[in-house]
């Protein structure tokens, strides 16, 4: 869990308390893959590892779109589903993205 007390960290904690199935969320710097703010509700979920890994995933998405002749920054959201969770990523301009992980009992709406 994040020990920081920034307003963004507080906002992520509020979101965690109100979102059924919440596991983790982070706002991540695309350049270095480090979370600028994060909150993990599930002790087994480490958002710092996920932030680094999914930064590469989002960069790969941008590269693929560029190769296809599409605008690499035209992605609204990226949704990844597994047997146990949903992960939703939203790019926040060029430099950051927001990622959230929810159990399948949760609701992304």
Protein language model features and the residues they cover:
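N-terminal glycine-rich anion-binding loops that anchor highly charged ligand groups
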Residues: 28
């Amino acid at each position: 869990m994040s020990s920081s007390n920034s307003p963004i960290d507080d906002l992520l904690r509020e979101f965690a308390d109100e979102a059924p199935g919440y596991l983790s969320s982070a706002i991540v710097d695309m350049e270095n893959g480090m979370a600028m703010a994060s909150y993990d509700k599930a002790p087994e979920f480490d958002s710092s590892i996920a932030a680094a890994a999914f930064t590469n995933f989002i960069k790969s998405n941008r590269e693929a779109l560029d190769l296809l002749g599409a605008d690499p920054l035209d992605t609204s959201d990226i949704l990844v589903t597994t047997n146990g969770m949903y992960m939703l990523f939203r790019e926040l301009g060029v430099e950051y993205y927001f990622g959230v992980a929810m159990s399948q009992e949760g609701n992304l709406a």
